[in-house]
Amino acid sequence: MNSGVRMVTRSRSRATRIASEGCREELAPREAAAEGRKSHRPVRHPRRTQKTHVAYEAANGEEGEDAEPLKVPVWEPQNWQQQLANIRIMRSKKDAPVDQLGAEHCYDASASPKVRRYQVLLSLMLSSQTKDQVTAGAMQRLRARGLTVESILQTDDDTLGRLIYPVGFWRNKVKYIKQTTAILQQRYEGDIPASVAELVALPGVGPKMAHLAMAVAWGTISGIAVDTHVHRIANRLRWTKKMTKTPEETRKNLEEWLPRVLWSEVNGLLVGFGQQICLPVHPRCQACLNKALCPAAQDL
């Protein structure tokens, strides 16, 4: 009787242990439940299986056990490093208008940081479709009257127009300057926004101005500032996958491949190059070190 109880108890214990450990291909030989007797069940040997490794492309952002990340080659233009090195040589004197009259040279260095940032933004708003010399002249006249948020809001439109004339589209810029300045006073306590998204939301402020404002006013490189010079030269050198129609399209193309460490340099470098050698009309190809490397040289 006692032997029967032991057999039932051990049998239940074995079943419980199997259930708790999960399904297995086979169990090790066990002692029989009866005292001193070996189990008469035949011992099963494990089947030898060979692993099959299947390579597949992971879907929906999931990676398989044997899947490796797919490497997508990054497009980059031919000879761009040599072209850039040549432009650096041609710009080594830093004697282009942008080098003396750019946005980083138009503010009052003795003013408070908030006022300096405001003056940087205004100089960028004035610079659109305007030569650097004309922008610098307008900024000098504005600064002579005390260029602050408060002074601009107190200046009537006619007077402001006379001060900034002859910058391009000066009538529209009078309106944009007044509207933007009012927004800065109401929403930003007289300072300028510290993000590209907020800057481009201001009247008269485009992507190029916003990225330059972030760099000059805030010391942050948020993107490549592309104006007409950078847009023109990037297309002539084939620094874009295809010919682009707008500066903003050019910016997106450049940022896809140009190393970020060069983003802050490329604007001033190409703007000055475009002012002195790679001119919009009748470029000075004979004086350009990239004459043999420029795809557009033979067409200009």
Swiss-Prot record:
Extent of Basic and acidic residues compositional bias: 22-37
Cofactor(s) recorded in Swiss-Prot or TrEMBL: [4Fe-4S] cluster
Alphabetical list of InterPro entries matching this protein: DNA_glycosylase, Endonuclease-III-like_CS2, Endonuclease3_FeS-loop_motif, HhH-GPD_domain, HhH_base_excis_C, HhH_motif, NTH1
One Pfam family from the record: HhH-GPD
An annotated GO cellular component: mitochondrion
Keyword NAD: no
Biased composition (Basic residues): 38-51
Targeting signal (transit peptide) range: 1-19
Catalytic activity: 2'-deoxyribonucleotide-(2'-deoxyribose 5'-phosphate)-2'-deoxyribonucleotide-DNA = a 3'-end 2'-deoxyribonucleotide-(2,3-dehydro-2,3-deoxyribose 5'-phosphate)-DNA + a 5'-end 5'-phospho-2'-deoxyribonucleoside-DNA + H(+)
Active site: 208
Binding-site list for [4Fe-4S] cluster: 278, 285, 288, 294
Localization per record: Nucleus; Mitochondrion
GO MF: 4 iron, 4 sulfur cluster binding; class I DNA-(apurinic or apyrimidinic site) endonuclease activity; damaged DNA binding; DNA N-glycosylase activity; DNA-(apurinic or apyrimidinic site) endonuclease activity; double-stranded DNA binding; metal ion binding; oxidized pyrimidine nucleobase lesion DNA N-glycosylase activity
Predominant subcellular localization, coarse grouping: nucleus
GO biological process, one term: base-excision repair, AP site formation
PANTHER family tied to this protein: ENDONUCLEASE III-LIKE PROTEIN 1 (PTHR43286:SF1)
Quaternary state and interactors: Interacts with YBX1. Interacts with ERCC5/XPG; the interaction stimulates NTHL1 activity and NTHL1 binding to its DNA substrate.
Family under the similarity heading: Belongs to the Nth/MutY family.
Identification of the protein by name: Endonuclease III-like protein 1
